[in-house]
Amino acid sequence: MKKTMRLIALLVFLAVSRQTSAQEKIRVGQGSISLQSGLMYIGKDRGLFAKYGLTTEVIYIPGGSTNVQVLVSGNLDLSQLSGAPGVAANLEGADLIYFVGLLDKLNYQLITRPEIKSIEQLKGKKFGVSRFGSSADFGMRAMLKLVGVDPVKEATILQIGDEPARIAAIKSANIDGTVANAPFGTEAERLNSILSPTPSKWIFHFSTPDC
């Protein structure tokens, strides 16, 4: 009998908790336009958040580092981010928690202006990222180092904005290259902006215990 009453009490508690949480609105940050970043919108449109009693507002804020700033300020309840911005913020005293991981690889592609035909031509060029400290910034610098280009001494890194803005900056010759997720790599191929080297050579694991 006691076990039955405990079970009933637990079910009542869960029901009340769900009703209470249904009245709560959460603000979710979204930092990029990419295939994996669409999960927040899918969750909202398919009613997955509502299923668990959450009313969700998805807010697009370009750049992971900018998302972190808004998150730390308390104006977001959670955000979909890559690893670099949150880790950097925690090293500076923030108390952010990552509770799920979508990717264990850096899946950016390097997109350059069509006239760049070799890795050697990357030296001395201008490259665009979303914001300093973002995953795009981390990925851009990591890729340059991977091919022997010092991102500090042999390249210029500029804050441009989100991926559509960076592709536009390549078209207008304001920058020479950038990193981008799908589907922007496919778009760049149609525009005759090369991916150098082939995308598969750029895919490497983040340094995490699960990788």
Provide a role label for each language-model segment.
Residues 205-211:
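Extracellular/periplasmic periplasmic-binding protein-like sensory domains
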Residues 2-10:
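Sec-dependent signal peptide recognition
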Residues 1, 22-24:
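Absolute protein N-terminus
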Residues 3-4, 19, 55:
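Intrinsically disordered/low-complexity terminal segments and short unstructured peptides
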Residues 16-22:
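Sec/Tat signal peptide C-region and signal peptidase I cleavage site
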Residues 24-152, 156-162, 166-172, 176-187, ...:
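Short, glycine-/small- and polar/acidic-enriched structural segments
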